[in-house]
Amino acid sequence: MHRRRYFYGAAILLFLTSFIGMLIYGYKTFYIEKELAASEEYRYHFALIAEETDNEYWRLIEEGARKEAAKQNVYLEYVAPQRADNDELLKLFDRMIAAKVDGIIVQGIDGRRFVDLVHKATERRIPVVTVDTDVKSSERKAYVGTDNHHAGELAGKSILENTEGEQFVGIVTGRFDAINQQERIAGLKHILEGNPRIQIVGVKESGITEIGATQATYSLLKEYPQITALVGTSALDGIGMVEGLEEIAPDKDVYITAFDLIPETLDAIEEGKIQATIAQFPEEMGKESVTSLLRLQEKDLLENLIYTETGIIDKDNLPALREGQP
């Protein structure tokens, strides 16, 4: 009797186990097929590889890219290192190539590894568009973004046209190893170094963080108390420079030129704490990058340098910008 009960119990348990297993398998199969069906609705799968995950500037590039991708029925995948890290970015680049995406938008990085990865993507017929920072020596199909040398020149012109007498300039830059930062500093020096009343006294790195810019500004002013003008070459440098100045020399009159149109920088211009910022339009960069990749699915571009708008924003033209006027 006990054996019979044991037999029936084991049979029921086996049946239930098999039944539950079938349900799970059926659900997974259905779920995967549903995911595949959803992915097949898109025309293409593009990857946007940013410098840093939650960087406000890169999120604006993503926003512009996503809007255009949605219009064109393209699936856009946004990936980035948690913090700015070239090695991690290159690993993500390699991973996206292995994933066989239809196109890659990526910040250019100086060095052989980046050039080799672009070549690898090209061999696999995956077009690469650099955004924000170009690497002309690579096989990238196009560059979309600011003419960074020209942007640096605009920062220099802002100082020349709005200051008088002898000026001592301190520079806060995002990363010494970033090509776009190097090009901006080169443009700035091109304008300022030929002028006898201007002297660049020092350059410090912010690590593209606000607190880093604050510390860099503090160090510059401590080392060079004669500084009369500060220039930041990455998005969070402006606010950091204001905080650094307020910390070490709150009553000192310093002409501050920032970079990018993040809300905190625009508010500081309105309050008179920052005198000017060099405007980039990251949403436009994102949009044009997706547009370029779409064209590259059919043929190479005739024009592979796609410069987006750049300009000087100050207290005079800020209201027009806020109202959305050109």
Feature roles, as predicted:
Residues 144-168, 212-214, 265, 280-298:
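Hydrophobic alpha-helical segments within soluble ligand-binding/sensing domains
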Residues 9-25:
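Hydrophobic membrane-insertion alpha-helices, especially the h-region
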Residues 69-85, 168-171, 192-211:
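Short beta-strand elements in bilobed, periplasmic/extracellular small-molecule ligand-binding domains
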Residues 44-63, 68, 72, 77-91, ...:
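Extracytoplasmic "Venus flytrap"
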